[in-house]
Amino acid sequence: MTILPTLHDLPKDQPFVLGIGFFDGCHLGHQEVFSEVKRLAKEKGAQPGVLTFYPHPMKVLAPDIHVPLLQSIDEKMDALAAQGMALAVCIRPDETFLAKSAEDFLGELARLPGLVGLVTGENFSFGHGGLGKSGDLVRFFEESRVTVRIVSLRENAGKKISSTAIRQCILAGEMEQAARFLGHPYTIRGDIVHGFRRGHDVLGFPTANLAVSEDRVLPPDGVYATRALVKGHTFPAITNIGNNPTFGNAKKTIETFIFDFDESIYGASFTLAWVARIRGEMKFASPDLLVAQIHQDIQKAKNRLHV
């Protein structure tokens, strides 16, 4: 997949279809858009692509309001490539871009010589203040070479799928529901860093400590059944996120004990899939009581992971 920083970098002598959206999480609803992009591109003999944005526009419009994200930019690009997109325009929104009127944005799209199709979700908005709606795309391009298709919101068990709904699930620890909306367990990619070594030296459970960006959505503190993707292989695991109150830590950590794994992975890239919440964070009177609880947690995690 070719990643481009602006609309002006798109090919001028080759036709393309663009799906437009922020696409945080690339969830099942977004995947409907990607599928429609590919269908329309095939009809038009064009390349399938997307127009997306990073970081979230709210980071520019209201820096004090924190919008936690489901994906890093690298994870988003990897997901778009996996969905079969050949092109990805990733605009970094600034005050100038966000001040554009809906009419100006439409005019910029219309001046793209290779554009032959646009696909968006029904709740898509654009232009200053979000005044432009998906229906405006249809009306603007209805007598042009550009075919516009609007994709209805997808539902799961009667609930509309959206990035906001998925964030709410994760923040509530409802990892199974988040997975139903995403189409897979929620994942976080980061680097393995050195921790306090209590898991190895005190408790007898060596853990991998995951460093993640501050703008990621994290589940509430507690213990989770997880899967760890390390060096191209996936392993069942158990993860604790929290402040380790038994030891009086102030800093939040994400520590993962990988079952039947004894390799050194410090500094390696690591992807963690959050499968199910086992329990909330607890403070124990002694390390021995914590170890006893960890054994119970591991068994529950293995049962949940079917290992």
Locate predicted features.
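Residues at the starts of beta-strands that form the adenosine-phosphate
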Residues: 45-49, 86-87, 147
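Phosphate/ribose-recognition catalytic cores of enzymes acting on nucleotide-derived substrates
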Residues: 195-307
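N-terminal Rossmann-like or analogous alpha/beta NTP/dinucleotide-binding catalytic cores
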Residues: 59-144
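N-terminal catalytic cores of NTP/NDP-binding nucleotidyl/phosphoryl-transfer enzymes
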Residues: 9-72
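Glycine-rich, Lys/Arg-enriched anion-binding loops that position phosphate/diphosphate groups
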Residues: 141-240
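N-terminal, positively charged, Ser/Thr/Ala/Gly-biased leader segments
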Residues: 3-9
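Residue-level signal for inorganic ion chemistry
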Residues: 27, 80, 118, 178, ...
